[in-house]
């Protein structure tokens, strides 16, 4: 008949939030590795299952982002404002790294340009 069917596949990135959540999940469950004398990677803690090709692994511990560190450029979290009622990244428990925090109340006056 001279006709043919065409299929077009489109590749697109997943939602940015989903990508970030997946990376954070992998970061949190990354496997600590060490290099043996023979130059091979080995789990630091042999009680864990060996990592799969999809798992993240690391050789060096991440720096403590709670504390100021000039060599890594981390400013730490001391003195930053946090949200007492939030359980997210801006929450005081997480941001203050369990060190406690000062509480204060503020009154913020803003012009709302309301029309009645």
Swiss-Prot record:
Pfam family, one: wnt
Gene3D superfamilies: 3.30.2460.20
Residues annotated as glycosylated: 69, 83
Modification comment: Palmitoleoylation is required for efficient binding to frizzled receptors. Depalmitoleoylation leads to Wnt signaling pathway inhibition.
InterPro entries: Wnt (IPR005817), Wnt_C (IPR043158)
Signal peptide as annotated in the record: none
Lipidation (O-palmitoleoyl serine): 1
KW Disulfide bond (keyword) present: yes
GO biological process: canonical Wnt signaling pathway; cell fate commitment; muscle cell differentiation; neuron differentiation; positive regulation of convergent extension involved in gastrulation; positive regulation of non-canonical Wnt signaling pathway
Keyword list, A-Z: Developmental protein, Disulfide bond, Extracellular matrix, Glycoprotein, Lipoprotein, Secreted, Wnt signaling pathway
Gene Ontology molecular functions: cytokine activity; frizzled binding
Ranges annotated as spanning the membrane: none
Disulphide bridges: 82-97
GO cellular component: extracellular space
Subcellular compartments: Secreted, Extracellular space, Extracellular matrix
Family according to the record: Belongs to the Wnt family.
Protein task: Ligand for members of the frizzled family of seven transmembrane receptors. Probable developmental protein. May be a signaling molecule which affects the development of discrete regions of tissues. Is likely to signal over only few cell diameters.
Protein name listed in UniProt: Protein Wnt-5b
Species for this entry: Alopias vulpinus (Common thresher shark)
Lineage, broadest ranks: Eukaryota, Metazoa, Chordata, Craniata, Vertebrata
Gene from which the chain derives: WNT-5B
